[in-house]
Amino acid sequence: MRKGRGSSVVGPALPVTAGGSVKEPRYRGVRKRPWGRFAAEIRDPLKKSRVWLGTFDSAVDAARAYDTAARNLRGPKAKTNFPIDCSPSSPLQPLTYLHNQNLCSPPVIQNQIDPFMDHRLYGGGNFQEQQQQQIISRPASSSMSSTVKSCSGPRPMEAAAASSSVAKPLHAIKRYPRTPPVAPEDCHSDCDSSSSVIDDGDDIASSSSRRKTPFQFDLNFPPLDGVDLFAGGIDDLHCTDLRL
């Protein structure tokens, strides 16, 4: 049984001189010194001068130093002695990776804020209903009768609108122009201890009982002579028991 031959790598044939000695290959940018070392240098296209790269023990090391300098000066169009090495040890791979990463990165979009817009969170639903709710919650003008209710906490309608606006997704946010401010003379609010006040022209009527003139006497002093306590009528007299 015949065995197959193993694969072998055959190097390039070196030129041979007439005397039988092997001629060393010549590399771009490499010169051999008389004492046996190899010097590498390259021409700078911008400065129009030669740049010294150093002295090496072998011609291959000097040729690789020239190739590295040529790629740094001329880029991918540089003429080199050896093809570009695609292995991870290549010094040009990190630069190529960073360049590709910058090209693939998306551009940064800056959100420009318009100072003339009122950024309110309006939902993507019916905007007219929200305007009607604002008109109802706003007090009417002085020409029309209105009821102003005094309260210490936030209005339930506004609280519900705020909670619904926060619950809406971000893609449903819209911007609308700022509503004009209401003039202070368009609304009148006379709030005191009474629950509600009705303003109808010059006639102001309170839902609570009208204020009545107090009796002209003081409980801290004895009754005065000549003062009619029942001048306002018996209906206005309210008896109160004082207990000490």
Swiss-Prot record:
Task: Write out the PTM section of this UniProt entry.
Answer: Phosphorylated by PKS3.
Keywords, in A-Z order: DNA-binding, Ethylene signaling pathway, Nucleus, Phosphoprotein, Plant defense, Repressor, Transcription, Transcription regulation
One GO process term, biological-process aspect: defense response
- State if Phosphoprotein is listed as a keyword: yes
For region Disordered, the annotated ranges are 136-156, 181-209
A Gene Ontology cellular component where this protein is annotated is:
nucleus
Which residues lie in Low complexity bias regions?
141-152, 192-208
Q: Which SMART domains match?
A: AP2 (SM00380)
What is an example of a GO molecular function annotated in this UniProt entry? DNA-binding transcription factor activity
What residue intervals hold the motif EAR-like (transcriptional repression)? 217-223
Its chief place of residence is nucleus
Positions of the DNA-binding region: 26-83
Among its keywords, does the record have rRNA-binding?
Answer: no
Localization: Nucleus
How does this polypeptide assemble, per the annotation? Interacts with SIN3 and HDA19.
What function does the entry list? Involved in the regulation of gene expression by abscisic acid, stress factors and by components of stress signal transduction pathways. Transcription factor that binds to the GCC-box pathogenesis-related promoter element. Part of a transcriptional repressor complex including a histone deacetylase.
- Record comment regarding domains: Contains a slightly degenerated ERF-associated amphiphilic repression (EAR) motif, which may be involved in the activity of transcriptional repression.
Assigned protein family = Belongs to the AP2/ERF transcription factor family. ERF subfamily.
From the Swiss-Prot or TrEMBL record, give the protein name: Ethylene-responsive transcription factor 7
The gene behind this protein is ERF7
